[in-house]
């Protein structure tokens, strides 16, 4: 018989670190609000969530590495908004910030990528709590589930 592992969304007793970009703060604050509400809804106590603010998405990898190495948290959630402009800056920042996943693999900790990469401000707004839901809330729920899944392995 095939064994299937399925994690629940009960975050009781979990500790999470949320790293949030100050750049495009009008978007990232809504992502953060969504994440914090999602953690609360899934049983994570407010005092078990630490928020770290970084200047932008480009600065996230070094902070993720430091937090992961500390072994203080069960997961790391990264929130930001990189919006395409007329230069190659978008591609560079989006590419660098996407490297955070490898840090999670190195440290065996879930690192959830909640950094929006959109073509327009409107798309970012939609993903930060309007038409397309709140990707910050989704990232927090993913973190809770991944912590539980890893505990089953």
From Swiss-Prot:
Q: Which residues bind 5-amino-6-(D-ribitylamino)uracil?
A: 23, 57-59, 81-83, 113
Instruction: Look up the record and give one Gene Ontology term from the biological process aspect.
Output: riboflavin biosynthetic process
The residues that hold (2S)-2-hydroxy-3-oxobutyl phosphate are 86-87, 127
Entry GO MF terms: 6,7-dimethyl-8-ribityllumazine synthase activity
Asked if the record carries the keyword Manganese, the reply is no
UniProt-listed PANTHER family: 6,7-DIMETHYL-8-RIBITYLLUMAZINE SYNTHASE, 6,7-DIMETHYL-8-RIBITYLLUMAZINE SYNTHASE DMRL SYNTHASE LUMAZINE SYNTHASE
**Cross-referenced HAMAP family, in alphabetical order?**
Lumazine_synth
Q: What protein does this entry describe? A: 6,7-dimethyl-8-ribityllumazine synthase
Q: What are the top taxonomic ranks of the organism? A: Bacteria, Pseudomonadati, Spirochaetota, Spirochaetia, Leptospirales
């Amino acid at each position: 018989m095939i064994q299937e592992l399925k994690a629940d969304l009960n975050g009781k007793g979990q500790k999470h670190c949320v790293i949030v970009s100050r750049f495009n703060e009008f978007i990232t604050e809504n992502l953060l609000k969504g994440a914090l509400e999602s953690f609360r809804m899934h049983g994570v106590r407010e005092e078990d969530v630490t928020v770290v603010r970084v200047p932008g998405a480009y600065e996230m990898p070094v902070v993720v590495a430091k937090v992961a190495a500390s072994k203080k948290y069960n997961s790391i959630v990264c929130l930001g908004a990189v919006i395409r402009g007329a230069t190659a800056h978008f591609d560079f920042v989006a590419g660098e910030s996407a490297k955070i996943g490898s840090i999670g693999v190195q440290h065996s900790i879930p690192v959830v990528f909640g950094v929006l990469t959109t073509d327009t401000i409107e798309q970012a707004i939609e993903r930060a709590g309007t038409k397309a839901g709140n990707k910050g809330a989704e990232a927090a729920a993913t973190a809770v589930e991944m912590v539980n899944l890893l505990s089953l392995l």
